[in-house]
Amino acid sequence: IKIFLNKLGLIETKIKNVLIIGGGKITIYLAEALLKSRYNVKIIEKEYDHCVYLSTILPNATIIHGDGSDQNILKEEGIGDTDALICLTGSDEENIIISMYAYKEKVKKIITKVNTPSFASLLETIGVASVISPKEITSSKIIRYVRSSANKHGSNILTLYKLVNNRVEAV
């Protein structure tokens, strides 16, 4: 019964092994948090010098020098055995292609960073990955701050309109 429910996605598998593609600032912050929570973290980064840097600041992570969009490297690094894949390269297209490959390889949890809204909605529509967008996260935080500040000072919002697929708000 457990296997059946798991296949339906009704039982979440515990995530232990996380593979991150790309070694930028978001990766560093995320890897630090994951390592503190005792996850096994492996990072694939293209730039050799950056791999050296990552290995010094993230000594408990496994750092791999290679192209994370190369299917052979992904297979060598055990993409089929990873519990979660997080695509954080600087290229939306590369992140999407890697996510689609991970989906084909049946990775349990796929998280993809995209900056282009139409790409985000495409990935969410086909159900390949959970999508994060730094721009949307930032704007959401700013809006939350402005609203809390306005509420603190007794602001009365009479009407709030959401436009363009909830991406624009007019007061």
Regions found by a protein language model. Name each.
Residues 1-171:
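Cytosolic regulatory regions of ion transport systems
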